[in-house]
């Protein structure tokens, strides 16, 4: 056990899907997995282990922001032997060609957080996903006939940022989506020799203020989860 995870040794699979919301972790486990067991519940940050098409997989929430997700990712990797983490979450779009309900595979993650600079001796760290995991996710999406966008995310420290001009810079540099965790998870995975990927559904458009309805969000979210889960099976076969 750790200060933040009360699961016994061996409770987690080697692959963990991580949404921000612990109740979303519960939903994923109950909807997509079989033989589900709740393995941790410290601070109501719920974690579950079950099987998907016979493959053992775990689901656990990571909270909001890089500090929170970094704690859980680090402890899962170093204390529970987790080898791969797939963050599954929502993001906002700043580009007119990236629409609400699009699914984004985060090949890299820029950030205004200083966490990776602290970790990397005050140098810039290129926070990138594992290529094989990203490729498997693209293959899973194609097999389902689902279009995905692949490219850079921006992991922001502030949800309510006063620097709205930064959205223009993000658009200029081709940022596909804005969220709050990918760069941190990629940094932790690199530091501890694990692998990570972020898959996001665009839930809001920052420019147009368009938002998904609850029903639309759920349907698109389910597509994203199936892509993530099927990508694990594809990765196993590679």
Curated annotation (Swiss-Prot):
Pfam families: PNP_UDP_1 (PF01048). A purine D-ribonucleoside binds at residues 4, 179-181, 203-204. It comes from the Bacteria. Phosphate binds at residues 20, 24, 43, 87-90. It catalyses: a purine D-ribonucleoside + phosphate = a purine nucleobase + alpha-D-ribose 1-phosphate; a purine 2'-deoxy-D-ribonucleoside + phosphate = a purine nucleobase + 2-deoxy-alpha-D-ribose 1-phosphate. GO terms for molecular function: purine-nucleoside phosphorylase activity. Keywords: Glycosyltransferase, Transferase. PROSITE patterns: PNP_UDP_1. The active site is at 204 (proton donor). It is an enzyme of class 2 (transferase). Gene3D superfamilies: Nucleoside phosphorylase domain (3.40.50.1580). Its EC number is 2.4.2.1. GO terms for biological process: purine nucleoside catabolic process. The record marks 217 as: Important for catalytic activity. GO terms for cellular component: cytosol. Belongs to the PNP/UDP phosphorylase family. Homohexamer; trimer of homodimers. Catalyzes the reversible phosphorolytic breakdown of the N-glycosidic bond in the beta-(deoxy)ribonucleoside molecules, with the formation of the corresponding free purine bases and pentose-1-phosphate. This is Purine nucleoside phosphorylase DeoD-type. The lineage of its organism: Bacteria, Pseudomonadati, Pseudomonadota, Gammaproteobacteria, Pasteurellales. The gene is deoD.
């Amino acid at each position: 056990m750790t200060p933040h995870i009360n699961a016994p040794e061996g409770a987690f699979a080697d692959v963990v899907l991580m949404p921000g919301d612990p109740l979303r972790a519960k939903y994923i486990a109950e909807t997509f997995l079989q033989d589900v067991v709740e393995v941790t519940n410290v601070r109501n940050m719920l974690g579950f282990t079950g099987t998907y098409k016979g493959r053992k997989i775990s689901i656990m929430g990571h909270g909001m922001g890089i500090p929170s997700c970094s704690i859980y990712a680090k402890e899962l990797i170093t204390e529970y032997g987790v080898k791969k983490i797939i963050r599954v979450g929502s993001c906002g779009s700043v580009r007119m060609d990236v629409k609400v309900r699009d699914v984004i595979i985060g090949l890299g993650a820029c950030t205004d957080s200083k966490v990776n600079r602290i970790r990397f001796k005050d140098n810039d760290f290129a926070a990138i996903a594992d290529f094989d995991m990203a490729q498997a996710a693209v293959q899973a999406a194609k097999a389902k006939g689902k279009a995905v966008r692949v490219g850079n995310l921006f992991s922001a420290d502030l949800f309510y940022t006063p620097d709205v001009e930064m959205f223009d810079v993000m658009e200029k540099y081709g940022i596909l989506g804005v969220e709050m965790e990918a760069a941190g998870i990629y940094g932790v995975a690199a530091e501890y020799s694990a692998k990570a990927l972020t898959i996001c559904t665009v839930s809001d458009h920052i420019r147009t203020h368009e938002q998904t309805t609850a029903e639309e969000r759920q349907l698109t979210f389910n597509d994203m989860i199936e892509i993530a889960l099927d990508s694990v099976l594809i990765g196993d076969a590679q």
